[in-house]
């Protein structure tokens, strides 16, 4: 079962290999992550999991049940909580601090969850990638949705019909991203490619749930050359900037 951390998307940049090849990466930094609660099959919870928290909060911004929950487990008041299913909960305890090197290493595949950038109200072509109508031949429906209804039966628009509406600002998870480097001094990682959300947005990074797939193992093997040829001083400068 995957373990992960709560962090912040710093932004995108690139790192250089020894031969000058540029690799696009996203920098993700992590604050102190606390193990808030350990759940086990042997307790009333009935399953194995870790509740992880990050980003300290003021008491006035939390409910009394949450404040009591944090005090019970001996951790600071926290703004963000996330639960990860694990196989070995007995190896952790409430109040324990998790660092980036405890969870990730270069060459890992990770899944990243975040809130996508909001783009406001958008039409069906932008929001759902509809092809649109022909460009000419005497009509005025170039970017229109087209027919949305049914016949007498059922006589309504199906729930979930793809139509114009608010685009973005939704939870998105990108799977199988390659960890290019881990920077313990900065408590940060560099992942190949982009991750959801805007800069300074909260993201959750966990060990990939699809790493067992043959296609992912081949990708992991194919990208090993990045780690072998990475100019370490380059990645360190990226994180510090």
From Swiss-Prot:
One of its GO terms (cellular component) is cytosolic large ribosomal subunit. One of its GO terms (molecular function) is structural constituent of ribosome. PROSITE patterns: RIBOSOMAL_L3. InterPro entries: Ribosomal_uL3, Ribosomal_uL3_bac/org-type, Ribosomal_uL3_CS, Transl_B-barrel_sf. Gene3D superfamilies: 3.30.160.810, Translation factors. GO terms for biological process: translation. Keywords: Ribonucleoprotein, Ribosomal protein, RNA-binding, rRNA-binding. Belongs to the universal ribosomal protein uL3 family. Part of the 50S ribosomal subunit. Forms a cluster with proteins L14 and L19. This is Large ribosomal subunit protein uL3.
